[in-house]
Amino acid sequence: MTAAVPTGNTYDKYGSANPVVRRLMTRFERDMAELLETAAPASILDVGCGEGVLTEQWARAIEGPVVGIDLEDPKLQEEWQRRSQPNLVFRTGLGDSLPYGEAGFEAVTAMEVLEHVPDPAAVLGEMSRVASRWLLVSVPREPLWRALNMVRGAYLRDLGNTPGHLNHWSKRGFADLVGRYGEIVELCSPPPWTMALVRV
């Protein structure tokens, strides 16, 4: 990942008061929690953690170490300081050259990250190198994501493409991509996302 890759959320979907967004996020978080429960990891590395919303949730859910990593950004570092937990560490780094040894974490996650990076295969390769058991990844499901943006009048000049989205996958296309890095144990479709739990 490079400095041209955006950090944080373009739209605060986790803090939105919009009832439709809240309903979508409730389903997203429920499916994600079920996949994490299936994986039951003792340690987690969250690649592209952004503000650390999910990273903090995971640190509260497991006793083992949880590390969030993202690009250098003072705004993110302010958020990270607010999310302090005894087993939680945030640090800066690149998804395509993770500063950890092989199989250093039981689970490695990238939630809403791969659509932003110039080389998703390089990031997934690094994630699978560092994971001893699991990858948990999610991306916007296309063309549904862009269509919903258009319906709500967002990003019309870019045909509904959210700023910073460089890559776009259908559910099948995403399964084909992540399936190269292990066995897909579960593939979920909480609208408008695709989410996969992969055994490495």
PLM features: residue spans?
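Conserved beta-strand signature within the Rossmann-like core of class I S-adenosyl-L-methionine
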Residues: 133-140
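A short, conserved alpha-helix within the catalytic core of class I
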Residues: 117-126
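Short "lid" loop at the C-terminus of a central beta-strand within the Rossmann-like core
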Residues: 141-145
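Hydrophobic adenine-recognition pocket in adenosine-nucleotide-binding enzymes
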Residues: 113
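A short helix->loop->beta-strand "cap" motif at the edges of active sites that frequently abuts
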Residues: 63-64, 131-133
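A conserved beta-strand element that flanks and buttresses the S-adenosyl-L-methionine
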Residues: 109
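Conserved acidic residues
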Residues: 42, 106, 133
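Conserved N-terminal segment of class I S-adenosyl-L-methionine
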Residues: 1-101, 124, 151-182, 186-200
